[in-house]
Amino acid sequence: MTHTLRVIFAGTPEFAAAALAAIHEAGFPVPLVLTQPDRPAGRGMKLQASAVKRYAVEHGMPVAQPPSLRRAGKFPAEAAEAIELLRATPHDVMVVAAYGLLLPQEVLDIPRAGCINIHASLLPRWRGAAPIHRAIEAGDAETGVTLMQMDVGLDTGAMIDEARIAIAPDDTTATLHDRLAADGARLIVAALERLERDGALPATPQPADGVTYAEKIGKHEAALDWRKAADVLARQVRAFDPFPGGVATLDGAAIKLWAAEPVAARGDAAPGTIVEAAPEGVIVACGAGALRVTQLQKPGGKRLPAREFLAGSPLAAGQRFALPDAA
């Protein structure tokens, strides 16, 4: 099926690429794609295109990569050029998903039908950069995707639609991301079809209560503080998969922990102490309870099940992981 509604798309990572693919496959014309500039990545630190750029190029869509859209920012000339390109590109609506650049009011006002954002939380909870990570870290029972009509605030726009999903006890940011990306793709296609048919999308202001902010994840957060409760640490491990991982330091070596579950305490060992190193998992004493770690990674190595990790890197009861302020 082909559509006449013309969609400019702005996004950067895989979450956004899923939405762009759905829009394209549904038959909506995409006259322009905005994505962040290529960035150095990987061990070789070679420039790599974003997931959105890769999809757009593969499917013959024009791509622009301005470093900013703010005339008053660090790149005023590039921003002005990008804004003129937006004005010169015939379109009806802009869809924004995990773009990573601020859109000033001048840009929001360009599309006839405004800008629709796909946000990976149930707004107003978890506005901001890392909603999936923070929902898992906080122990939320559910999360979802919200479509909103963008305004200049940080994820403060009126809500068009949402989809809710339960957070499973073994969900990681990686697994939850994929389900939310699929839901976001489905929601935006349905919304664009309604917009094309009806000419407008009803939207409801966000409630004033229940606002929380999902701060960007920093590498410094990876260190596990064994003085915390085991269930808190288990959520941290799941929330930080695939980035930045949960890090435990032993004899100066940073070991990444990728899968763990809380278990009952074993004795009265000090937090961070290994109380058992078995093929089924490495059990570590915590501030409350204990953590059974079932997947580990040594520096320069691969993620391994506990059984394989211990075969190559033996651990023993009585060894103690460093506490963050002592690492």
From Swiss-Prot:
Reaction catalysed by this enzyme: L-methionyl-tRNA(fMet) + (6R)-10-formyltetrahydrofolate = N-formyl-L-methionyl-tRNA(fMet) + (6S)-5,6,7,8-tetrahydrofolate + H(+)
UniProt cross-references to Pfam families, sorted A to Z: Formyl_trans_C, Formyl_trans_N
Family named by the database record: Belongs to the Fmt family.
Name recorded for this polypeptide: Methionyl-tRNA formyltransferase
EC annotation from Swiss-Prot or TrEMBL: 2.1.2.9
Organism, scientific name: Burkholderia vietnamiensis (strain G4 / LMG 22486) (Burkholderia cepacia (strain R1808))
Residues at which (6S)-5,6,7,8-tetrahydrofolate binds: S121, L122, L123, P124
Keyword Transferase carried by entry: yes
Enzyme class label: transferase
GO MF annotations, alphabetized: methionyl-tRNA formyltransferase activity
Source taxon at top rank: Bacteria
Any one Gene Ontology cellular component term annotated for this protein: cytosol
Keyword Lipid metabolism in annotation: no
Function: Attaches a formyl group to the free amino group of methionyl-tRNA(fMet). The formyl group appears to play a dual role in the initiator identity of N-formylmethionyl-tRNA by promoting its recognition by IF2 and preventing the misappropriation of this tRNA by the elongation apparatus.
Keywords: Protein biosynthesis, Transferase
